[in-house]
């Protein structure tokens, strides 16, 4: 375990760890949780997936926990307001999709679902066997609880109980699967230490925790959001091209953290890329984008992203071909819409309806600044409508927002 700790420190991705962890000898098992609050994992989850892969490389058996029960509650960590509760059918569907995704990214890994043990736990048993081991004083002292208790929003008993459920998960895995280590982002440290204390109070043995830094920008905001929404790992929600472009657009100062947390490149290569960042940041970002997209979507997904990028950006000053437009739509960089749904509508309304712009206000500003392009020509009039003369090959329209954001409309 000492080798892993040293590597994480050298890489700069060790946030916190339990005393004595470095002396733990392998083989041991470690787990990391994924709550099914959406039908897809997002780019923030990729940090955890890479972390589990890193553990496996050091002889530690990784376990992925899908929170089929805790996903019904919602983790208050890092949240200023309470999550909207999902219904049971949605959580069940999300859980299946998340488990399938984890199995594809982590072949052979043990995947467990806490609904299998928490779902049958009665309220009386929970209060007797779990609740009695926790003291309100220490729970209220946790940062995540303290921040919410004294906020205008407050915290519900439902969210307040999340810490106990996560602690029970750790104890269950410790007892049933000999999982002695729980890992997570830095915002999970309070929950993890509560689980360690719970395991000790029950006399089960010594457990440990290990956390990595959250991936945030210079303002402390989690990386992985854009004006269009979350960056998903499911290619149907975020096509490989969009994932590729997301990393190309990141500020130069953020790419160093990205390559440490979202890739498995060895430390020596990371340090060499750090040096190259000062002289050629765009080349480094392109390389890191290629590494991550290939890791997430495979060689085929990377090829799609590269082909789409070449078609979009090499098309400036030349006509884009029908074959290129078809390939872009098939690679997920397009949207298929019935012709009758859009012909005759204002572009101002269309770009909002398709999610290309977040609001009419944003669309108006882009038009006024000549930053919204239709088939590579700036849209000058916000009252302009889509008519048949604007269709390429009587079917397609190429939308552009500035230099980076592109989309093909397929009026099939």
Curated annotation (Swiss-Prot):
GO cellular component: cytosol
Binding site for ATP: 225
Enzyme kind, highest EC tier: ligase
Entry's Gene Ontology BP terms: tyrosyl-tRNA aminoacylation
Main location: cytoplasm
Residue numbers binding L-tyrosine: 31, 162, 166
Coiled-coil annotated spans: none
Gene3D superfamilies found in the cross-reference section: HUPs (3.40.50.620), RNA-binding S4 domain (3.10.290.10), Tyrosyl-Transfer RNA Synthetase (1.10.240.10)
S4 RNA-binding domain: residues covered: 345-411
Reaction catalyzed: tRNA(Tyr) + L-tyrosine + ATP = L-tyrosyl-tRNA(Tyr) + AMP + diphosphate + H(+)
InterPro entries the record matches: aa-tRNA-synth_Ic (IPR002305), Rossmann-like_a/b/a_fold (IPR014729), S4_RNA-bd (IPR002942), S4_RNA-bd_sf (IPR036986), Tyr-tRNA-ligase (IPR002307), Tyr-tRNA-ligase_bac-type (IPR024088), Tyr-tRNA-ligase_bac_1 (IPR024107)
SUPFAM superfamilies per record: Alpha-L RNA-binding motif, Nucleotidylyl transferase
Homology family: Belongs to the class-I aminoacyl-tRNA synthetase family. TyrS type 1 subfamily.
Role description: Catalyzes the attachment of tyrosine to tRNA(Tyr) in a two-step reaction: tyrosine is first activated by ATP to form Tyr-AMP and then transferred to the acceptor end of tRNA(Tyr).
Quaternary structure, from the entry: Homodimer.
Protein name as catalogued: Tyrosine--tRNA ligase
Species of origin: Chlamydia trachomatis serovar A (strain ATCC VR-571B / DSM 19440 / HAR-13)
């Amino acid at each position: 375990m000492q080798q892993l700790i040293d590597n994480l420190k050298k890489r700069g991705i060790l946030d916190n760890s339990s005393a004595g962890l470095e002396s733990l000898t392998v083989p041991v098992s470690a787990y990391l949780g994924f709550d099914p609050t959406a039908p897809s994992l997002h780019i923030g989850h990729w940090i955890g997936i890479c972390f589990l892969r890193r553990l496996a490389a050091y002889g530690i058996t990784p376990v992925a926990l899908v929170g089929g029960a805790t996903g019904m509650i919602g983790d208050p960590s890092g949240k200023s307001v309470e999550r909207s509760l999902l219904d049971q059918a949605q959580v069940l569907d999300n859980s299946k999709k998340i488990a399938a995704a984890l199995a594809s990214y982590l072949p052979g890994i043990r995947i467990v679902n806490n609904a299998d043990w928490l779902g049958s736990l009665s309220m009386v048993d929970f209060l007797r066997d779990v609740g009695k081991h926790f003291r309100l004083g220490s729970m209220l002292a946790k940062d995540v609880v303290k921040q919410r208790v004294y906020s205008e929003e407050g915290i519900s008993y439902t969210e307040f109980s999340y810490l106990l459920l996560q602690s029970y998960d750790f104890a269950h895995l410790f007892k049933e699967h000999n999982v002695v280590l729980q890992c997570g982002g830095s915002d999970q440290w309070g929950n993890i230490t509560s689980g360690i204390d719970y395991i000790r109070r029950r006399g089960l043995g010594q457990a440990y925790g290990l956390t990595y830094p959250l991936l945030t920008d210079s303002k402390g905001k989690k990386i992985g959001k854009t004006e269009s929404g979350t960056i998903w790992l499911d290619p149907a929600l975020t096509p490989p091209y969009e994932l590729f472009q997301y990393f190309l657009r990141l500020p130069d100062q953020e790419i160093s953290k990205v390559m440490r947390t979202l890739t498995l490149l060895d430390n020596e290569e990371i340090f060499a890329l750090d040096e190259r960042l000062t002289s050629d940041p765009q080349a480094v970002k392109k390389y890191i984008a290629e590494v991550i997209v290939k890791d997430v979507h495979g060689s085929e997904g990377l090829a799609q992203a590269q082909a789409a990028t070449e078609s979009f950006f090499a098309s400036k000053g030349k006509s884009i071909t029908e074959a290129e437009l078809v390939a872009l739509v098939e690679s997920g960089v397009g949207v298929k819409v019935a012709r009758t749904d859009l012909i005759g509508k204002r572009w101002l309304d269309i770009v909002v309806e398709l999610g290309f712009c977040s609001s009419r206000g944003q669309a108006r500003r882009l038009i006024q600044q000549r930053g919204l392009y239709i088939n590579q020509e700036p849209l000058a009039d916000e009252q302009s409508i889509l008519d048949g003369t604007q269709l390429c090959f009587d079917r397609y329209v190429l939308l552009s927002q500035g230099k980076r954001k592109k989309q093909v409309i397929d009026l099939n």
